[in-house]
From Swiss-Prot:
Belongs to the class-II pyridoxal-phosphate-dependent aminotransferase family. BioF subfamily. This is Putative 8-amino-7-oxononanoate synthase. The lineage of its organism: Bacteria, Pseudomonadati, Pseudomonadota, Betaproteobacteria, Burkholderiales. Pathway: Cofactor biosynthesis; biotin biosynthesis. Pyridoxal 5'-phosphate binds at G109, W110, S187, D212, E213, A214, H215, T241, F242, S243, K244. It is an enzyme of class 2 (transferase). Its EC number is 2.3.1.47. The gene is bioF. The modification N6-(pyridoxal phosphate)lysine is found at K244. GO terms for biological process: biotin biosynthetic process. One of its GO terms (molecular function) is pyridoxal phosphate binding. It comes from Bordetella parapertussis (strain 12822 / ATCC BAA-587 / NCTC 13253). It catalyses: 6-carboxyhexanoyl-[ACP] + L-alanine + H(+) = (8S)-8-amino-7-oxononanoate + holo-[ACP] + CO2. InterPro entries: Aminotrans_II_pyridoxalP_BS, Aminotransferase_I/II_large, AON_synthase_class-II, AONS_Archaea/Proteobacteria, PyrdxlP-dep_Trfase, PyrdxlP-dep_Trfase_major, PyrdxlP-dep_Trfase_small. Its cofactor is pyridoxal 5'-phosphate. Keywords: Biotin biosynthesis, Pyridoxal phosphate, Transferase.
Length: 397
């Protein structure tokens, strides 16, 4: 027993009273687009496996093959003796697909944002305190990276480029390198940044653009390689993950050769972490072969999003500015979100309730994540269940 167990218990009780306590639930494998949870198989509308690749046979086969040939682990960090030829092979393939000089693999999206940003700001400190402009709805890992670096964030209104440009113009004469840190697709709202306009704005103001492509990679942009590909000349740094649209694990940054070489020398999350293992690299490599050829699956996925948003609007449920495979059903009250999620689960569908502090108070929601593994039948089930479930929640309120 810990000496602080009474404090931990009190904190959990307070979270339960606010209807924001979390609990782990045991899941087991099921066919793509589904999940076996607590002994029941549910249609899964909470997974980030947007293209249904997590159970694709090519990923599993190559993961197994590379593990058999090269071992279960990389044995060390890459700067010690864990830099396998496989890492460089995957990075070269990724850089070609992203249209950048280089790419660098990291262990997770959180690790990338939390470690890469401080490394960038450290280099920039030679010119004085950096100016860091961040979207108000950025992911927690981006905020964490800024906080870890000790920089002050200058926050602009969500996806409001006019406000961002105003803030940049206000500080035009101030010393220090300038950074814009934002996402191309926002994970809780499913809306997109105007990446070409962002890149043009960054160029006008001589500002480094850091773009988190976690939820765009695999789904959006040329060949599914993210929205940075829509900007002439690209962006300064694109971060993305392999754990969502690519059905595997890990993360990357893509940019100039000088940038990636610098991160090898300055990014703590790269330097002090054991390298990704061969099985993971094999799955990533296979996904990179598949994704550019999946335009039809991407079109169907985004079409399902359009149909779902139209249905939610007809029911009077707010889905914000979503324009992607992520569609929030924003119901406001945390209790209502939990009740609606429970009603859907009773009907055989998993759509997890998202509550504060993940989203602002008063904006609790179901975060509905669509997948190419879902067909019209599953979408029909979801639309019908949402309509009936929302009626039941309102009647009980």
């Amino acid at each position: 027993m810990s000496k602080l167990d009474s404090l931990f218990t009190a904190a959990l009780e307070q979270a339960a009273q606010r209807q924001v306590r979390r609990r782990l639930r045991r899941a087991t494998a099921a066919p793509p687009g589904r999940l076996a949870l607590d002994g029941r198989t549910l249609v899964n509308f909470s997974s980030n496996d947007y293209l249904g690749l997590a159970r694709h046979p090519l990923l599993a086969e190559r993961a197994s093959l590379w593990a058999t040939r090269h071992g279960a682990g990389a044995q060390a960090s890459r700067l010690v003796c864990g830099n396998l030829d496989l890492h460089e092979q995957v990075e070269a393939k990724l850089a070609r697909l992203k249209g950048t000089e280089a790419a660098l693999l990291l262990a997770s999206g959180w690790q990338a944002n939390a470690a890469v940003l401080p490394a960038l700001f450290k280099a920039a400190a030679a010119q004085g305190e950096p100016q860091v402009y961040t979207d108000r709805l950025n992911h927690a890992s981006l905020h964490h990276g800024c906080q870890a670096a000790g920089v002050r964030q200058i926050r602009f209104r969500h996806n409001d480029l006019a406000h961002l440009e105003h803030l940049l113009a206000e500080r035009a004469g101030a010393p220090g390198a300038r950074f814009i840190v934002t996402e191309s697709v926002f994970s809780m709202d499913g809306d997109r940044a105007d990446v070409p306009a962002l890149a043009a704005l960054a160029a006008r103001h001589h500002t480094f653009l850091y773009l988190d492509e976690a939820h765009a990679t695999g789904v959006l942009g040329p060949r599914g390689m993210g929205l940075a590909g829509l900007a002439p000349g690209g962006v300064d740094l694109a971060m993305g993950t392999f754990s969502k649209g690519l059905g595997s694990f890990g993360a990357y940054v893509a940019g100039s050769r000088a940038l990636c070489d610098y991160l090898v020398n300055a990014c703590s999350g790269f330097i002090y972490t054991t390298a990704l293992p061969p099985a993971v690299l094999g799955a990533i490599d296979a996904a990179l072969d598949l994704v550019p050829r999946l335009d039809q699956a991407r079109a169907a996925l985004l079409g399902h999003g359009e149909r779902l948003r139209a249905s939610l609007a007809a029911q009077g449920i707010d889905c914000g500015a979503s324009s992607t495979q992520i569609v929030p059903a924003i119901v406001g009250d945390a209790g209502h979100a939990l009740a609606l999620a429970a009603e859907l689960e009773r009907r055989g569908l998993l759509a997890v309730a998202i509550r504060p502090p993940t989203v602002p108070a008063g904006t609790s929601r179901l975060r509905i994540a669509l997948s190419a593994a879902h067909g019209e039948t599953e979408l029909d089930q979801l639309i019908e269940a949402l309509a009936a479930g929302w009626r039941a929640v309102r009647q009980a309120a």
